[in-house]
Swiss-Prot record:
One of its GO terms (cellular component) is acrosomal lumen. Creates a 3 um hole in the egg vitelline layer through which the sperm passes. Does not have enzyme activity. Species-specific interaction between the sperm protein lysin and the egg protein VERL exposes a basic surface on lysin that may dissociate the egg vitelline layer via electrostatic repulsion. Plays a role in ensuring species-specific fertilization. CDD domains: Lysin-Sp18 (cd00243). Disulfide bonds: none annotated. Keywords: Cytoplasmic vesicle, Fertilization, Signal. This is Egg-lysin. Its main location: cytoplasm. Pfam families: Egg_lysin (PF01303). The lineage of its organism: Eukaryota, Metazoa, Spiralia, Lophotrochozoa, Mollusca. Monomer. Homodimer. Molecules associate into dimers and then rapidly dissociate again. Interacts (as a monomer) with the egg vitelline layer protein VERL (via VERL repeats); each VERL chain can bind multiple copies of lysin.
Amino acid sequence: MKLLVLCIFAMMATLAMSRSWHYVEPKFLNKAFEVALKVQIIAGFDRGLVKWLRVHGRTLSTVQKKALYFVNRRYMQTHWANYMLWINKKIDALGRTPVVGDYTRLGAEIGRRIDMAYFYDFLKDKNMIPKYLPYMEEINRMRPADVPVKYMGK
């Protein structure tokens, strides 16, 4: 019983922190805006990975490096809905109709501000870099604009 109560409190805290106690209904986002976001976010993550690999990547195999590129794409997919909440606030604050450049700027800011180096260090130090599987290769081969995301906008 104590475990059940603890799980319920954990779930409530998670919901409170992730969605501020209200459901954000997904709406359509213009494809050009979505592409601008994805390209810039992944480019920022990949730039950070290249810098990290220059310093720490000597002991990693080629397959492990590919897996880390997949981690970048999966991280973007996983946190897409939260990015959209932040992006919607920024776009609403503009006070005008957004253009592709606004989404490009915000995507670049996300890619630059999220420091994935700590995550790479953790995966490497704990020997938790995922095994490279065919579905990872499929996502890595996709252009950043084609990486699927589930939350489509405001």
